[in-house]
């Protein structure tokens, strides 16, 4: 099972009630605690799953909507086995189709949508949007696309098909393998 953002949260939450899921691929999921802010999505995740489920998270280091600190929280709470791959110089929309257009249009849309909002809402939105770089300053969307397809397929093949080559690949030096393809990642430990 896989999902992005709120879909990533629903992926994690589904495991509490559904024993059919045998591997997950949350992409920049919601639900990670960020500092002192009370977050109902975070508190709703118990990680008391029906069974042990291998997790491969793919997240971005510059996520302006769901910051990396929340991903660290999810990593700490998620039971083993788990891998968290961080795509460097990427933002939240790197896990969508048409990354560049989504990245740039979201910022413009939210600025317009909150133009008449109350001051607290504007302040909160401005703080988030101030972290959002234009797509021209981030890695190309193809890096995320190739990372998700390559690692995601390996993760599902290793865990759903018992493919030993895929499992061996996931245990290899992923940073070097991706670097050879021009994709910079780090691994959360």
Listing of model-derived features with the role each one plays in the protein:
Residues 3-5:
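Conserved alpha/beta-hydrolase "nucleophile elbow" surrounding the catalytic nucleophile
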Residues 7, 64, 166:
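Short, electropositive, low-hydrophobicity segments enriched in small/polar residues
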Residues 7-10, 70, 148, 152:
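Stable alpha-helical elements in mature extracytoplasmic
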Residues 8-18:
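Short glycine-enriched nucleophile-adjacent loop
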Residues 12-13, 70-74, 170-174:
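Intrinsically disordered, low-complexity boundary segments flanking structured domains
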Residues 17, 70, 98-102:
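Residue-level detector of alpha-helical segments with a strong bias toward transmembrane helices
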Residues 22-95:
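The feature captures the conserved acid-bearing segment of alpha/beta-hydrolase catalytic domains
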Residues 80, 89, 97-189:
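Alpha/beta-hydrolase-fold serine-hydrolase catalytic core, especially in secreted/extracellular enzymes
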């Amino acid at each position: 099972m896989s999902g992005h953002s709120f879909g990533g949260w629903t992926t994690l939450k589904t495991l509490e009630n559904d024993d059919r899921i045998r591997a997950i691929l949350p992409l920049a999921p919601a639900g990670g605690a960020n500092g002192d802010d009370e977050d109902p999505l975070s508190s709703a995740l118990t990680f008391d799953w029906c069974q042990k489920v291998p997790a491969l998270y793919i997240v971005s280091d510059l996520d302006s909507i769901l910051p990396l600190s929340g991903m660290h929280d999810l990593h700490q709470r998620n039971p083993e086995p788990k891998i968290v791959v961080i795509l460097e110089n990427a933002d939240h929309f790197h896990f969508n189709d048409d990354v560049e257009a989504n990245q740039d249009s979201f910022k413009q849309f939210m600025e317009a949508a909150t133009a008449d909002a109350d001051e607290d809402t504007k302040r909160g939105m401005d703080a988030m949007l101030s972290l959002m770089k234009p797509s021209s300053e981030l890695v190309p969307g193809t890096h995320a696309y190739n990372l998700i397809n390559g690692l995601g397929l390996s993760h599902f093949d290793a865990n759903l098909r018992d493919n030993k080559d895929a499992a061996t690949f996931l245990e290899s030096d992923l940073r070097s393998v991706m670097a050879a393809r021009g994709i910079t990642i780090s691994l959360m430990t």
